[in-house]
Amino acid sequence: MTSLSTHLNDRKLWKIDKDEVAYYRHMVFNSSIEKLIDAASSKRDKHWGNVISYSRKIFVPLTNMCRDTCSYCTFVKHPDDPDAKIMSPQEVLLSAREGEKKGCKELLFSLGEKPEKRYAKPTRALETLGYEAMTDYLTDMCKLVIEKTSLLPHVNAGTLNEYEIVKLKNVCASMGMMLETTSKRLTQKGGPHYACPDKVPIQRIRTLISAGY
């Protein structure tokens, strides 16, 4: 009998069609977790080897305001909180240069999603900086880091449309996207993603599709 590991290694999972989805779904629900772990490990090692690499990053929270209100989030600050803010270009550069001193190669821009679409405070703060949208400001901060430092920007900006992705692609080394769940149930009243427009699964999936996953 052919092993589960062999079946997986005979297929390129990144070129999967509907029939293969059904095939793997059947295997998942009819195999033990140990076999699945063994199969996944075997496939990983075959294609990527056993070397783990890393790149030192400095974390730069460009804004800790967000229009989403995920109940588990400890990063976001409500605009009424005195600690809620948008970092200035000077603060970004100061953090970047501190990262250089520590031997960092990348700068990780993390930020809440589109706070200006919900609250007045981030809207006013962006206007003071000369911007209407957080993604436009983020794009220019990536340019600033590239022009003034040796660091490579990495962006975690959440849901983006194709236009925003193209803009950011030109000024950052990589972009991250968290697909926490594909469950619509979690967006219902009482769920952790209730009243969080950017956590509706289809919105995040559309970003991945636009990025050319």
Predicted regions and their residues:
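Short amphipathic alpha-helical segments, especially helix-boundary/capping motifs
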Residues: 1, 13-19, 46, 69-73, ...
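Flexible, acidic/Gly-rich N-terminal and inter-domain linker regions that tether
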Residues: 1-69
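Structural signal for hydrophobic packing residues in well-ordered secondary-structure cores
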Residues: 12, 44-48, 74, 96, ...
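A generic short-segment signal for beta-strand/edge and adjacent turn/coil regions
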Residues: 23-30, 41, 76-78, 123-124, ...
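Canonical Radical SAM [4Fe-4S] cluster-binding loop centered on the CxxxCxxC motif
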Residues: 52-91, 114-115
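Conserved Radical SAM active-site core
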Residues: 79-213
